[in-house]
């Protein structure tokens, strides 16, 4: 059924096992220290259980999930979430979000966004600027220094490189493509 049932991730020092219901929803995620052993003792695992009602996730581990009438989450990681105009998040905990008539996010808390003619964010009010190529975001300019992204075969950003070719940030992902780790070197903060 092409479902991920085991991930042995040496980078993170973890092995994860997954089980699913007949709809393909994850029922249980079990975690232990990295191992390549075929059979691992059940007592070595920490487990997170998932509970569903139809298409909605009701709970995972100790976190309960609640949704509005169209399926937007009302809470995330114990913090409240508010929505407007369908799927536009207008607040998360104490952070407010604003949008323009085209549905583009104009602000997130105190950070404002500037768009180009292709509806791409090119600048944030905190001084961060974005560089694009034909495949999307290619890098950033921060405090006058240009950094470019190195991407892996799936298009995930795996490193941020300064103008001298130094790796200043490395990103690592799990088998699902979720960003799972960040390794920082000194960033030029003029």
Q: Which residue ranges define each predicted feature?
A:
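Generic structural signal for coil-to-beta-strand starts
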Residues: 3, 23-25, 70-72, 88, ...
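Extracellular, surface-exposed repeat architectures
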Residues: 53-58
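Beta-strand-dense domains in secreted/periplasmic systems and polymorphic toxin scaffolds
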Residues: 4-8, 26-29, 43, 60-61, ...
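A motif-centric feature for acidic-aromatic and gly/ser/thr-rich catalytic loops and repeats
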Residues: 34-51, 144-190
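Extracellular repeat-rich scaffold modules on cell surfaces
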Residues: 1, 65-88
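Repeat-solenoid scaffold signature
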Residues: 1-28, 32, 84-108
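Short, acidic, Ser/Thr-enriched surface-loop or helix-capping motifs
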Residues: 21, 52, 68, 83-86, ...
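A residue-level detector for well-ordered beta-strand positions
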Residues: 18, 48-50, 64-65, 81, ...
């Amino acid at each position: 059924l092409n479902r991920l049932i085991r991930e042995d991730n040496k980078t993170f020092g973890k092995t994860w096992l997954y089980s699913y219901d007949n709809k393909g929803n994850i029922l249980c995620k079990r975690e232990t220290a990295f191992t390549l052993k075929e059979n691992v003792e059940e007592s070595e695992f920490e487990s997170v259980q998932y509970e569903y009602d139809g298409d909605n996730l009701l709970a995972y581990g100790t976190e309960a999930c609640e949704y509005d009438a169209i399926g937007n989450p009302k809470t995330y990681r114990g913090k409240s979430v508010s929505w407007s105009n369908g799927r536009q998040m207008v607040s998360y905990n104490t952070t407010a979000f604003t949008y323009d008539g085209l549905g583009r996010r104009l602000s997130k808390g105190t950070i404002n966004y500037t768009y180009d003619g292709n509806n791409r964010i090119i600048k944030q009010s905190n001084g961060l600027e974005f560089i694009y190529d034909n495949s999307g975001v290619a890098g950033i300019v921060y405090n006058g220094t240009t950094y470019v992204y190195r991407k892996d075969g799936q298009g995930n950003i795996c490193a941020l490189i300064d103008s001298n070719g130094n790796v200043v940030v490395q990103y690592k992902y799990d088998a699902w493509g979720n960003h799972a780790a960040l390794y920082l070197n000194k960033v030029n903060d003029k």
